[in-house]
From Swiss-Prot:
One of its GO terms (molecular function) is triose-phosphate isomerase activity. This is Triosephosphate isomerase. Substrate binds at N9, W10, K11, G176, S215, G236, G237. InterPro entries: Aldolase_TIM, TIM_sf, TrioseP_Isoase_bac/euk, Triosephosphate_isomerase, Triosephosphate_isomerase_AS. Transmembrane segments: none annotated. It is found in: Cytoplasm. It comes from Buchnera aphidicola subsp. Cinara cedri (strain Cc). Homodimer.
Length: 254
């Protein structure tokens, strides 16, 4: 059985006060689930050390994540973060390709693929977000869009691209809307993604996970995690609410 991975994407949220209160309680909660679930928190990067210091080194199921990297390893690029820097401070998982960055920062598939390759070069775990808009869904282009976003990774990195990697299927129309995709629909797309990646890999792919993201809450997590090809969640707003996030973790492990 695959060990579920639950990632909390805090986006541009958080404070020292929130972290001290939230993680003190989460730390105790995770003791119960350390063998059967991996939990990742991706805060604004400047809070990473504070979070690290609040978790004891014996927490084998807890990891720090980041929300983005630059397309350069170093140099005169004001305000950017390098994967080398993230690795240096103990971050393991990095979200790339989120629709908010595609839209607000005009990140193309090519830019995202380059970031993916940089993460792999540093032995970090990319969490590649893919998904369709509402119009693309209506036009029945979901699978074509997912294929396009996956293909460029294979074209740039090669057939072993998705070993030790995560794809988060996040239908753009559901993010932040409160309207999650139907579980059977999610399973259909996740199954397609898994088979497509396997067919392009030309080997027995290892440590490849598929998450669902898009208005994940304690109310829909149970039915979603029961889907065969869903290995966990990329949680947005709900990951900032201790009771909600803890319940999602608990449900995932039922």
């Amino acid at each position: 059985m695959i060990k579920p991975i639950i990632v909390g994407n805090w986006k541009l949220n958080g404070s020292k006060k929130l972290i001290e209160s939230f993680l003190k309680q989460l730390n105790q909660f995770l003791i119960k689930y350390y063998k059967i679930c991996t939990v990742v928190i991706a805060p604004p990067v400047l809070y990473s050390h504070l979070i690290q210091n609040m978790f004891s080194s014996d927490k084998k199921n807890f990891f720090l994540g980041a929300q983005n990297i630059d397309i350069h390893f170093s140099g005169p690029f004001t305000g950017e973060i390098s994967p080398i820097m993230l690795k240096d401070i103990g971050i393991k998982y990095v979200i790339i390709g989120h629709s908010e960055r595609r839209l607000n920062h005009k990140e193309t598939n090519e830019i995202i693929a380059k970031k993916f390759c940089m993460l792999k070069e540093e032995n970090l775990v990319p969490i590649l977000c893919i998904g369709e808009t509402k119009k693309e869904k209506i036009d029945k282009k979901t699978k074509d869009i997912c294929k396009k976003q996956i293909d460029i990774i294979f074209n740039m990195y090669g057939s072993n691209a998705f070993d030790n990697s995560i794809i988060a299927y996040e239908p753009i129309w559901s993010i932040g809307s409160g309207n999650s995709a139907a579980p059977k629909e999610v399973q259909c797309i996740a199954h397609f993604i898994r088979n497509y990646v396997k067919s392009k890999s030309n080997h027995n792919i290892e440590n490849f996970f598929i998450q669902y993201g898009g208005s994940v809450t304690k109310n829909n997590a149970k039915e979603l995690i029961y889907q065969k090809d869903i290995d966990g969640f990329l949680v947005g707003g709900a990951s900032l609410q201790l009771e909600e996030f803890s319940k999602i973790i608990e449900i995932t492990n039922i």
